[in-house]
Every structure is written in C-alpha cells, then in structure tokens.
Amino acid sequence: ESLSSSCNEKITTIKNEKVSQIDSDNNIQVVTTNSSTHFGKIIVDSRSNIKQQEIKSPLIHQAFVGSEIELTKERFNPDEVTLMSFIKKENQIEFIYILPFTKKRALVETTVFSIEPDLKAIENTHKEILKTYEPYKEIRQEKAIIPMVVISPFGEKRILKIGIGGGMMRASSGYSMRRVANWAIKIGERRLSEDNISTFRHRSNKWLNYLDKIFLNVILKYPEKGPYLFMMLFRRAKMPPLIRFLSDKPSGADLINILLCMPKRLMLKGLAKKKND
C-alpha cells in the first residue's frame, strides 16, 4: 500500500505489453515494451529476470502442479498435512504435498526439484495421483516452474527490484511469501522516493544464504539424498527454531540447532563442492 501511495493518487494499469528494455536518460527511466515507451523517475521492477552475474549458487528449478479437489466421500484429515511424500526418481527430487481444508476438500500438489524439470511429465504423474481420489471435482489448478537460487541483485540507482528478481525467494525452498511479508512489514507506511530507494531494497540474511548454497550443492550433486536430508531436518530439529528458520527469522542459536540436526558428512560434501565452484 505504501508503494502504491508513493505513485501519486492516480495509477494507470497497462496490460498486454511485454517489457523488452529499461534504460536511463538524464535521471529519467525509459521502459521500452513491444508496443510503446513509458517514462518515470523510479521503476519498481517485479520481473523474475535474473542476470547471470547476480547468481551466487547452483541454479535448480522447482516445478509443481497442484489441484484443489473436492471428493464425494470423506478421505482427508483436516488436522494433518502431508508436507513431503517422496516418489523415487533418478536425478531429481519428487514429492507430493497434501493440504486438507475439510474431510472432503484439499490441495494436492506434485513437486519436482531438478536442473531441467519436465512439466508435462509432472502433469502426467499428477493425473495418476489424482486417480486414487476418484470420483472428485477439480476446483482449480496451479502450475509453474520457479528458480531455486541465491542471488545478489544489482542495486541500480533508480530501479527497485522486488519479488524473485529482488532476492525475495528462499533458495532452498522456492518459497517467497514469508520474505515478502517480512519486507512489507519492515517498510511499513514509508513513501518511496528517489532519496530513500536504497532503504526499500530487500537484504537477505547472509548466513541463511550460506546454508542455502550448501543445500543446493547437495541436492545438485546427490539428488537421491534429498529425502534423507529433509527427513533428518524435520525429525531432529526442535520445532520453535525450525519454524523461525523456515520463516526467515532465525537467531544465531537457531542456526546452530539446525546445523546440528543435518547429516554432517553430507553437508560437508556440499561445503566442499561449494568451495571448489
């Protein structure tokens, strides 16, 4: 809301245009699209275009297909969530996520971590999984491929990057909602201007980024160990530190607790590969 109010009272929404280039001309930002040109003093850029020079870790992709379904019979337990039910596949990590809303209604999602995920193959697997719940009604479906990578966004003078391009996605999970929420709370009601744009930039916890780099190295080199890595984390970690770790607000003690829960030999292999990269 504070960003919107910073754009004066009138906001014009322009649809069906694709940004091809952003340039600076005498402190005026020039946005060139496939059909027109736009000008402004400040650009808020929410695109996910990551430059090669900004990448600071292995680049892995998370692909998912999720369906919210409603059954004719009661088969779900609203008090239980299935976070990761792993499917054994070569050279990738694949699992099912089930979030029940009622005894008959739930979100069922098939997710893959891979360098080059095949979304069509994931859709086919997802269809087979849904067959086990027949008869059902599909209320909605979501699918996407998102990057899992640690980035260090360039701080361009009059361009504020937000979202994936602004480093707001957690590399080890592909999840951005928590970081975006934390960032929104931090900026509060302040108004964006040319003088304070640097204070609006998201800054990731360097220790979280360091651990995420090691994690990405492990699942890149040893994808078959992914299920073991996750199981050790959720079995051994104390719940409050784990929640703060996953919520992007860990203390130093939380980070130590998480490290002690991880398979040491496997993490050392990830660390060794990181140093060699």
Name each region found by the language model.
Residues E1:
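Glycine-rich active-site loop/strand segments that organize a redox cofactor
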Residues S6-E138, M148-G155:
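Predominantly flavin-linked oxidoreductase catalytic cores and closely associated redox partners
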Residues Q53-K56, I60, E156, S173-I187:
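A short alpha/beta connector and helix-capping loop motif
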Residues K89, I93, K143-I162, A171, ...:
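FAD-binding beta-loop-beta segment adjacent to the flavin cofactor pocket
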Residues I98, K103-R105, G155-S173:
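Short FAD-binding loop at a beta-strand-to-alpha-helix junction that anchors the flavin cofactor
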Residues T111-F113, Q141-A144, G165-G167, S172-Y175:
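Histidine- and/or cysteine-centered catalytic micro-motif in compact active-site loops
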Residues E116-E142, P153, K157-L160, N182-R203:
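Flavin-binding catalytic cores
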Residues A181, I185-D277:
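C-terminal helical "tail/cap" subdomain of flavin- and related membrane-associated enzymes
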